Amino acid sequence: MSQAEQNFMITYARRKSARASCYIKPGNGKVFVNDIPIEIIPIEVVRYKIMEPLVLAGDKITSSIEARIYTQGGGIMGQADAARMALARALVKFTNSKELVEIYKSYDRTMLAGDPRQTESEKWMRYSARRWRQKAYR
């Protein structure tokens, strides 16, 4: 394996029905989400959610990497959560730092471990997963 292949990390993450993959390598601090620079993502909540692992990691680590995140499926926030998880896992794997793992776990455990909750499916003869027809006694 060459030196360039050793410094290249790929991680995956899922949240609900959204999937994300993160490709990380040494670089100059640029992060792209679906080939769009993270700075120009129009929805601020999504942008800040994806940037959380970078902010927690610090400027020293952030300025020395280049990350490309590709998301598909699900909704906007599901994709943002999956991208955040994939980026956090990639940074931990790339830096091989126990301190970074502890920082992420103390801030939000789902950055590394994930969130297994799924939408409950709709049942037959019901309007939704739990809603039933109102019962009339008179």
UniProtKB/Swiss-Prot annotation:
PROSITE patterns: RIBOSOMAL_S9. Transmembrane segments: none annotated. GO terms for cellular component: cytosolic small ribosomal subunit. GO terms for biological process: maturation of SSU-rRNA from tricistronic rRNA transcript (SSU-rRNA, 5.8S rRNA, LSU-rRNA); translation. GO terms for molecular function: RNA binding; structural constituent of ribosome. Signal peptide: none annotated. The keyword Ribosomal protein applies. Keywords: Ribonucleoprotein, Ribosomal protein. InterPro entries: Ribosomal_Su5_D2-typ_SF, Ribosomal_uS9, Ribosomal_uS9_archaeal, Ribosomal_uS9_CS, Ribsml_uS5_D2-typ_fold_subgr. Belongs to the universal ribosomal protein uS9 family. NCBIfam families: PRK00474.1, uS9_arch. PANTHER family: RIBOSOMAL PROTEIN S16 (PTHR21569:SF16), RIBOSOMAL PROTEIN S9 (PTHR21569). This is Small ribosomal subunit protein uS9.
